[in-house]
Amino acid sequence: MKKIVFLSLSPETWDGLETLWDNATADPENEVTVIPIPTYKRNSDDSLSDAHYTLSGYPDNVPITDVNAYSLKANHPDIIYTQNVQDTSNPGFCVHPAFHTDALKACTDQLVYVPYMCTEEISLDNKPYLDSIKMLFICPALLSNVDRIIVQSNNLKELYLYYLAGGDPGLIKHWSGKISCDDYPRNEILKKYDRLTVYRPDEWDTLLCPDSDGHRKVVLLCTSVMGILTNEHHVINKLRELFEDFMNNTDDHVLIWRPYPAIKEAIKNLRPGLVDDYDNLISFYLDNHVGILDELPSPTSAIIISDEYIGDECGVMELYKATGKPVSRLDYGV
């Protein structure tokens, strides 16, 4: 009997583990446990917010175990999957110390890191640039405690190898066997479902399944935190213009707009002058029934249902590229 534990940061990041869980539970010889773990926001004075912890919001077919009901030390699982390795190195976020990688490493034979965030494909030719962003990918805990890493693409695998091994043939051989990209869950889940089987709220069907024959083109529009912080009112103006265009083309197109969930909090803290305009934009979209406002925890449904992507360069765009469907970056005219 092999014991396998999945440590989930939240229901919103479960799609970053789901297909690995599917594979593990398919073997009756495996004892599989899913444990949501407490997370905290780190304030500017280095104090921590109250813990964020929930057992709800996960798929109905996934049994959830309370963090206090399972001892990693006593059970010593064969494999632990974690979505976080920045034990103390993230200035804005952390997990409970019991789930830092050094503690996890002492409780398992194999600690596997599955990064949730997707990043744009990065050219490996610009070494100074690669060195300048190294801290976004590599931290001491990763080097010391992680046995295996699952990344989104071969490009990211090569990036990790550059950071971890440099040009050392021995280290390249050592790390190559520890980094995989053909089983990255956020890519694999896009193959697991199709338009008919992927979850979507009932209210989406009003627009997605009209009382007419023929398929209307479904366009996914994503707005990122960085996009709005960088381009500010240009984003508001461009989106308003785009919404008006879609209002005039509802017979042929359906728009799914997915603003990144943290946008409101980000502009409140960093661009307070945009808050009212952003709220008005949301109201305009909803009041005029422009399209679907995607507030689901994961972008998986919108990616699978839609025919085309337009919007910001972000993790959703990178996932969309893996589908082979058309992708366009939205130009804010700045």
Model region roles, listed by residue range:
Residues R271-E295:
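Nucleotide-activated donor-binding/catalytic signature segment of Leloir-type glycosyltransferases, i.e.
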Residues D294-V334:
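A donor-sugar binding/catalytic signature common to diverse glycosyltransferases
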Residues S49, P77-N84, E188, K192-W204, ...:
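Short, surface-exposed amphipathic charged segments that create phosphate/polyanion-binding patches used
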Residues M1-P11, L220-S224:
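Nucleotide-activated donor-dependent transferases that construct or modify glycoconjugates
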Residues D27-T33, T250-L255, G291:
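A generic structural motif
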Residues G16-L20, Y184-D279:
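Conserved catalytic-core segment of nucleotide-activated headgroup transferases in glycan assembly
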Residues V5-I189:
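Active-site and donor-binding regions of nucleotide-sugar-utilizing enzymes
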Residues T88-N90, E158, G227-L229, M317-E318:
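Short glycine-rich, flexible loops that bind phosphorylated cofactors or substrates
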